[in-house]
């Protein structure tokens, strides 16, 4: 029995899809456990680039199962568009499995997301407007429609009519807007469900069978720890728990099945949307990182905010997600900078702190305390071992590992699959 969880340690976009794809080659099952199509994974190999949102990164290995767990919220229409796009490019998707307990995103969730963000005005949280939050709200309110319900025509019809009646009153009272009608939704989404029917099953049983058979299971996280609804920069967070602990809830396996947790980070920091970002850069170094690193959101296309590496953030992520190994991506992006910086602590009201504050107002007052290290100019994109890295780049990574108290097991020097390097066996 062996399993690895891949989680983002920052605010998402760390390169989890790339690392999951890299590790998937030695896995038997790859499973997503949280989020929805608000996530964006970019995978590059064989001269081709693929952008995924809902489909697990393991889909590219046709002999392995790619599982969407019960903790994921699924927009059936968006999922079919993604699958059709892969099929058109010659990627088979018959190895996909979808939990029959996964919640369904419907048009009224997208409308609600839009209206609620508009109502917030200056207090907007930067939602992707994919209906993720409203779908999770319906789940907790126990009015959500699950994949198992979508497949049964009478069940779906009954639940949809009831929900639209409720949403109509809510939309009118809160936003003075109308809810998408039953006729706007039913036929299209029932048909989408029927197209997905062959993939829908009890994925918890699939995972349990894999463990019993001593197969290797890889759990693929979405977003990042700092977007976690409990442990992130609340309220500027996602609506689920991207931390490793949610694997058990989001896939239906026990905690004893988790063997290792790989925390994925960039050699710097990035963030999309609003919210605190203590090490954010607004100067030429920031411009360099954004352009060289192609820092634009996979899902939204928005320019990402960028900043120096923050060890306060990563120590927090290591603790709340139980990270055993670190994967550092995008080392090549920092090439050419005279000086690179690592945030080692914050100054809050004249005092040095080393842990991430829970209070948002305190966080806004935090000033990063930096340690400066010399940069490097050598091309690193073909490097395959730590020893081959320029001395300054190697010392930079070693200092990150030391500050965060976690070993580096993977490092990446470019976007392609072949530019990802394994320092130790993980399975």
Curated annotation (Swiss-Prot):
Signal peptide: none annotated. It comes from the Bacteria. Its cofactor is Mg(2+). Mg(2+) binds at residues 13, 40. Keywords: Cytoplasm, GTP-binding, Ligase, Magnesium, Metal-binding, Nucleotide-binding, Purine biosynthesis. PANTHER family: ADENYLOSUCCINATE SYNTHETASE (PTHR11846:SF0). NCBIfam families: PRK01117.1, purA. Belongs to the adenylosuccinate synthetase family. This is Adenylosuccinate synthetase. The lineage of its organism: Bacteria, Bacillati, Bacillota, Bacilli, Bacillales.
């Amino acid at each position: 029995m062996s399993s690895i969880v891949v989680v983002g340690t920052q605010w998402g976009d760390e390169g989890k899809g790339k690392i999951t794809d890299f590790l998937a080659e030695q896995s038997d099952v790859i499973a997503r456990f949280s989020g929805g199509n608000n996530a964006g994974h970019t995978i590059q190999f064989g001269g081709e680039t693929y952008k995924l949102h809902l489909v697990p990164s393991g889909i590219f290995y046709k002999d392995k199962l790619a599982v969407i767990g019960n903790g994921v919220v699924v927009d059936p229409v968006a999922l079919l568009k993604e699958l059709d796009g892969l099929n058109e490019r010659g990627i088979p998707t018959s190895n996909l499995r979808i939990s029959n307990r996964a919640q369904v995103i419907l048009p009224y969730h997208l409308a609600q997301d839009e209206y609620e963000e508009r109502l917030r005005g200056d207090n907007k949280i930067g939602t992707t407007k994919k209906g993720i939050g409203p779908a999770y709200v319906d789940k907790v309110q126990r009015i959500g429609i699950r994949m198992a319900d979508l497949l049964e025509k009478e069940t779906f019809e009954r639940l949809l009519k009831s929900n639209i009646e409720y949403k109509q009153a809510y939309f009118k009272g809160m936003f003075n807007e109308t809810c998408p009608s039953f006729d706007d939704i039913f036929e299209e989404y029932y048909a989408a469900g029927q197209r997905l029917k062959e993939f829908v099953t009890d994925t918890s049983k699939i995972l349990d069978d894999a463990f019993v058979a001593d197969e290797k299971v890889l759990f693929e996280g979405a977003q990042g720890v700092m977007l976690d609804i409990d442990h992130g920069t609340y309220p500027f967070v996602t609506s689920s728990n991207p931390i490793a602990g949610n694997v058990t809830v989001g896939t239906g396996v026990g905690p004893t099945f988790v063997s290792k947790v790989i925390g994925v980070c960039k050699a710097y920091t990035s963030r999309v949307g609003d919210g605190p970002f203590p090490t954010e850069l607004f100067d030429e170094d920031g411009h360099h990182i954004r352009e060289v690193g192609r820092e634009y959101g996979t899902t939204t296309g928005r320019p990402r905010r960028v900043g120096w590496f923050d060890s306060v953030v990563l120590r927090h992520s290591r603790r709340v997600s139980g990270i055993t190994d670190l994967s550092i991506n995008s080392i090549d992006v920092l090439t050419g900078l005279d000086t690179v910086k690592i945030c080692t602590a914050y100054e809050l009201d004249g005092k040095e702190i080393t842990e991430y504050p829970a209070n948002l107002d305190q966080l806004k007052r935090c000033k990063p305390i930096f340690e400066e290290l010399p940069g490097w100019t050598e091309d690193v994109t073909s490097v395959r071992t730590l020893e081959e890295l320029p001395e300054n780049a190697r010392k930079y990574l070693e200092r990150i590992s030391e500050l965060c108290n976690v070993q580096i097991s993977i490092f990446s020097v470019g976007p392609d699959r072949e530019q990802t390097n394994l320092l130790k066996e993980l399975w």
